[in-house]
């Protein structure tokens, strides 16, 4: 009988800024926890061969990470997911097919590690993506759409990302979409000789907060338009120059939209926040940065408003990529090594329970025979403790070489066959040994840096 492998079959589907237009990414974007939960539940209901699943949705990518049941056909899972996406997002399967990138097994693991390490980002080295992945994993885990398999994968991905940051310095310049946007705004400020160094920011989410911090660092005064005054108060406590930032409810947008030359918009709204009906003619030119996906700013009809989207910033990012080529090469070497180490780690996790089961089986057998001997008075009761120690040392000595051999072979491809044979020979799958203590091996500290 063929032995079933216990190694997880990993699978990813990715739609990114490299393969899909901003217009199409807007349709795929999920900005609500309710919508995300419904989407994951749809996958769980209609894709029985998908064991675990999570979704990463950002301004530059929409990705599905999954582990599949043994024997599942990856192309069938891909087609099923594309069909669900097409129905859910009112898109055609053929359009999605043209843009999707599928990875399985080692290439899927390598892809997840690369994304988490910011090597696949529009701005290579930006650190925001790691936090976004942690949030995506946390949500899927807490809603019970993922457990052991994806926890193992993401646990290692976060370690890999930290290693890339620490060993390559790829993130030292602190470049991100928000910083690139502010840098471009600063160039515009100087070229246009704008008199007042002030900016309007709509939103108070993660992206908006990064924009605000970069603007304050460049000595701008910032007016924030948002919905949550309490959130603003908490945010202000983090700032070095809180006096340079003020807050108004977004309901007052009409009062301020025509007063600022520089505007940044980054909210999770699925609709346009800034609409043409709000606009009035001004004597000055205006430069607006829409950093949201879906976009928050309707394409302006006035000639003196210049609008930059996330994709418009790509040419400004190329210089950053070229400057970091050496760090990027080293980072990919780390990711490649981490992918190999991940599978070695996974295989060792499969071996450890077998070793513990063997030792527990030996202990139970020795204890059983000792109790028989005591009951039949083959040995005096006062010798019980010493005999237990002798038996413990004996089965430790007996299992020493098999333990070393198992750990050594855990990193080899034949590990599954060896582990399966031992389980079959010693009937370990049917033993009463409890594996609950091993659950800590799968714990993922997603909240740690």
UniProtKB/Swiss-Prot annotation:
It catalyses: (S)-4-amino-5-oxopentanoate + tRNA(Glu) + NADP(+) = L-glutamyl-tRNA(Glu) + NADPH + H(+). The keyword Oxidoreductase applies. Keywords: NADP, Oxidoreductase, Porphyrin biosynthesis. Pathway: Porphyrin-containing compound metabolism; protoporphyrin-IX biosynthesis; 5-aminolevulinate from L-glutamyl-tRNA(Glu): step 1/2. GO terms for molecular function: glutamyl-tRNA reductase activity; NADP binding. The record marks 111 as: Important for activity. Belongs to the glutamyl-tRNA reductase family. This is Glutamyl-tRNA reductase. It comes from Helicobacter pylori (strain P12). The lineage of its organism: Bacteria, Pseudomonadati, Campylobacterota, Epsilonproteobacteria, Campylobacterales. The gene is hemA.
């Amino acid at each position: 009988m063929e032995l079933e492998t216990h190694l997880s079959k990993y699978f990813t589907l990715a739609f990114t800024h490299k393969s899909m237009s901003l217009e199409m990414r807007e349709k795929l974007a999920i900005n609500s926890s309710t919508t995300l939960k419904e989407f994951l539940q749809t996958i769980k209901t209609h894709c029985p061969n998908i064991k675990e699943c999570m979704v990463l949705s950002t301004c530059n990518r929409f990705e599905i990470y999954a582990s599949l049941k043994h024997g599942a056909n990856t192309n069938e899972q891909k087609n099923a997911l594309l069909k669900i996406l097409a129905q859910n997002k009112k898109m055609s399967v053929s359009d999605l097919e043209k843009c999707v990138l599928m990875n399985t097994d080692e290439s899927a693991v390598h892809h997840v590690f690369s994304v988490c390490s910011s090597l696949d980002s529009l701005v290579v080295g930006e650190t925001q993506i790691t936090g976004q992945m942690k949030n995506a994993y946390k949500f899927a885990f807490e809603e019970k759409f993922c457990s052991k398999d994806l926890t193992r994968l993401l646990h290692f991905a976060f370690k890999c990302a930290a290693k890339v940051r620490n060993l390559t310095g790829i993130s030292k310049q602190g470049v991100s979409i928000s910083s690139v946007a502010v840098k471009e705004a600063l160039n515009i400020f100087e070229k246009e000789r704008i008199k007042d160094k002030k900016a309007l920011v709509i939103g108070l989410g993660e992206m908006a907060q990064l924009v605000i911090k970069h603007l304050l660092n460049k000595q701008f005064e910032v007016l924030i338009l948002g919905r949550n005054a309490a959130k603003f108060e908490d945010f202000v406590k983090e700032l070095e120059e809180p006096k340079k930032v003020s807050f108004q409810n977004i309901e007052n947008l009409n009062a301020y939209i025509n007063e600022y030359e520089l505007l940044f918009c980054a909210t999770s709204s699925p609709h346009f926040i800034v609409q043409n009906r709000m606009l009035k003619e001004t004597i000055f030119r205006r430069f607006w940065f829409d950093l949201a996906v879906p976009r928050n700013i309707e394409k302006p009809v006035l000639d003196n408003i210049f609008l930059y989207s996330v994709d418009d910033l790509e040419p400004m990012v190329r210089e950053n990529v070229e400057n970091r080529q050496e760090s990027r090469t080293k980072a990919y070497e780390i990711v490649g090594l981490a992918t190999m180490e991940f599978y070695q780690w996974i295989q060792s996790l499969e071996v450890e329970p077998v070793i513990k089961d063997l030792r527990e089986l030996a202990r139970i057998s020795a204890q059983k025979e000792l109790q028989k001997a005591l009951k039949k008075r083959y040995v005096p009761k006062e010798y019980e403790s010493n005999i237990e120690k002798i038996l413990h040392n004996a089965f430790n000595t007996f299992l020493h070489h098999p333990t070393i051999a198992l750990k050594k072979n855990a990193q080899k491809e034949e590990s599954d066959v060896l582990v399966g044979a031992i389980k079959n020979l010693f009937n370990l799958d049917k033993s009463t040994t409890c594996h609950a203590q091993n659950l800590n091996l799968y714990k993922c500290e997603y909240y740690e840096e």
